[in-house]
Curated annotation (Swiss-Prot):
InterPro entries: Aromatic_Lyase, Fumarase/histidase_N, L-Aspartase-like, Phe/His_NH3-lyase_AS, Phe_NH3-lyase, Phe_NH3-lyase_shielding_dom_sf. This is Phenylalanine ammonia-lyase 1. Its EC number is 4.3.1.24. Pfam families: Lyase_aromatic. It is an enzyme of class 4 (lyase). SUPFAM superfamilies: L-aspartase-like (SSF48557).
Amino acid sequence: MEATNGHQNGSFCLSTAKGNNDPLNWGAAAEAMKGSHLDEVKRMVAEYRKPVVRLGGETLTIAQVAAVAGHDHGVAVELSESAREGVKASSEWVMNSMNNGTDSYGVTTGFGATSHRRTKQGGALQKELIRFLNAGIFGNGTESSHTLPHTATRAAMLVRINTLLQGYSGIRFEILEAITKLLNNNVTPCLDLRGTITASGDLVPLSYIAGLLTGRPNSKAVGPSGEVLNAKEAFELASINSEFFELQPKEGLALVNGTAVGSGLASMVLFEANILAVLSEVLSAIFAEVMQGKPEFTDHLTHKLKHHPGQIEAAAIMEHILDGSSYMKAAKKLHEIDPLQKPKQDRYALRTSPQWLGPLIEVIRFSTKSIEREINSVNDNPLIDVSRNKALHGGNFQGTPIGVSMDNTRLALASIGKLMFAQFSELVNDFYNNGLPSNLTASRNPSLDYGFKGAEIAMASYCSELQYLANPVTTHVQSAEQHNQDVNSLGLISSRKTNEAIEILKLMSSTFLIALCQAIDLRHLEENLKNSVKNTVSQVSKRILTTGVNGELHPSRFCEKDLLKVVDREYIFSYIDDPCSATYPLMQKLRQVLVDHALVNAECEKDVNSSIFQKIAIFEEELKNLLPKEVEGARAAYESGKAAIPNKIQECRSYPLYKFVREELGTGLLTGEKVRSPGEEFDKLFTAMCQGKIIDPLMECLGEWNGAPLPIS
């Protein structure tokens, strides 16, 4: 594109091709959506981990904003020197227009509804602008509940620099360098949490950045170690080798009249939302594994016929996780046993998870692109067009893209949470979970172990709050500033509420993943216990039922196969706490097999030597003597890490997440016999998620995916 205001304007979304055939920018917006969502998330992660962010006003990403905001990463910010001339040109234009007597909003006029007032004292006007906008309330201290989180402030500073670098705002480059030094030295101004409607930008909070730069006595900052600083101390710690800035005409307005606080926080939120969206896809696949689901719900033809790209990708990701899964192979065999007595289809939380998650991923992805456009936009007023020698009075400060994107994202997060809660509820319910114990209890005595019962109550609470937060913010607009700002975006408020939703979804995700790991371990225990029961039943059958008292072959020798079928069919946790109890299904059904064979034995039952009925009591007595010891031995071997059958999860693509939770975080199987509470384990994972540690194992689960569904065969 043509050079304007002294620099090349190749913006984040505008096509720069010669003879631009996309004047409305729809083509560029569509182009940005090409490729898979997962590939985009991988690019975000790579950008997030780069040590330097170079700002030129045109290519800032939400991942870079998130990286700089989390200052513990030590990401350095650099300004593009090529932007200096454009910034300087617009600043000089403002001074020249003032000297020439040109009437410009915010330079010679009052503000908002009082713009009919006039003054020639341009510097004093900017000083008053910052003073009257310092209307926030902080409460006690710099870490109070009324102070914007310092990470969000850093995000806002970065975005505001990026906007002003484009050279349409009339501000000196030196001021942008000063803000950059604050960022690079981890000196963060204190901004008020509330008080902006993001409609003439985030006026009130941004005024506190300007207040620090101009040395206002009420301004405060926080240093790298959390120490409270006044403006002078902040300048010294940030190595800003100048006096406080005396704002020139338009410079105060340039600092405050933008959407950077709302869009900065939105960037942080969306970086996490994209990660959580991918996590929800993988967790749904693990849910299918431990629930012994039918993997045909991921078949590509089903989703191809629905056409929605988010759904197609979600299904393909789940299909990739489940393809070759040892759980799916075992489940297939289980489904072949008594198929007419089992549901033909899985419940919706499993079977329709791609259809549910797909549109939500599309919403999050579209919101990401919208906010990425916003943080690369020029969003103040008036705009200085040096090339045409004029100031343009418009409304780019209206943060509607933020409010709408955040409302939509929050709705998507709430729906992800709803699915997660439905899946969790099935997982802990022994009426639905295909043989896992109620509440995922793992103790020998289920009467003294209630497992994840408290966790399910907590999940209901999280889900309810998340659903409440899904209500829109943007429908609550109030006319403000003497009815000049009569429509306003509420962008920062919506970003804040979405940030709350992110935290709640993390609580749900950490609780759910710990529960899934518990279920994985219970399936491992189940397999070993069932193996022990089968071996014992087989051993007792051979010993008791093969021959008669005189060593002759006995008719009961044919019972063994059917007895083992009973063990295969019966859920192990329905009887394993007392396997030989006459009131539990194992002994009842083993006896029924022997009775049925005895009835078929007919006339032979009259002979004591060939009677199967005569064998029943002996068989049961032998089983009662042997089975409890064998079961306890199998459980003890499992608990000591010497299980006869290894854990299936090691052969699955979902293993990296399990390994991360169990080995890196040091969590374990929860039982009523141990002191450790579920919440302690949830806390470990939640903290790790907040630190971004879950990203690598999550991506490792999908490392082999080629970005396409399996062929339809």
